[in-house]
Amino acid sequence: NAGQIDLKDRINEKKSSNQPFIIVFVGINGTGKTTSLAKVANMLKNEKFSVVIAAADTYRAGAIEQLREHTNRLNLKIIAQNYGSDPAAVAKDAVLYAQSHKVDCVLVDTAGRMQTSSNLMEQIAKITKVVNPDMKIFVGDSLAGNDTVNQAREFHKQVKFDCSILTKSDADARGGAALSIVKVTSSPIIYVGVGQEYDDIVKF
């Protein structure tokens, strides 16, 4: 049984100990990871949680600007440094900011590609070691079928994520990749992305 996850409950639980709830998003480039992060941020904001976002993909050209565009539209605080800077340090900065400003949630964007797959996994492992997230979410493209299942398997082996978001989907996409991901990772899919707008994210 992959179990169920109630994000709101978990955040409130952490909030009662006066600590921010930290979510790290993982997945390869092109899957809609950054957009999914923005959708989750918007959802949390609508639930009246305060949110800060860490631009810890310091590898891909344009990644920081893309995230900044989302945070500008959503009127959210972003913590960013320069390209090539240590992503774990960026994530840590965001957590420190959240602690000192009593922010409820820290959402961390991470790289989806580096020189090698092992570089990428090491980097994500370092981020998780430094910030000790409450939740790691894998983002996969529902249209990529087996590729997505293989990515999920690989990421899960290396970084043990807690749950997944499937993008480019529709609310009825309960078959195929979704079932396989749940099976190979023994972890639930919590949301599916069903469109381009910030509200286009639904519980699975």
PLM features per residue range, with description:
Residues T31-T35, A61-I64, N119-E122, N146-D147:
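Short low-complexity stretches enriched in small and charged residues
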Residues K33, D57, D109, D141, ...:
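Acidic active-site catalytic centers that drive phospho-/nucleotidyl reactions
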Residues A111-R113:
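Short glycine-rich anion-binding loops that position phosphate/pyrophosphate groups of nucleotides
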Residues D86-S100, Q115-F204:
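Conserved catalytic-core segment of NTP-binding enzymes
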Residues N1-A56, A63-Y83, A91-Q99, D104-V108:
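Primarily NTPase-proximal linker/entry elements flanking Walker-type ATP/GTP-binding cores
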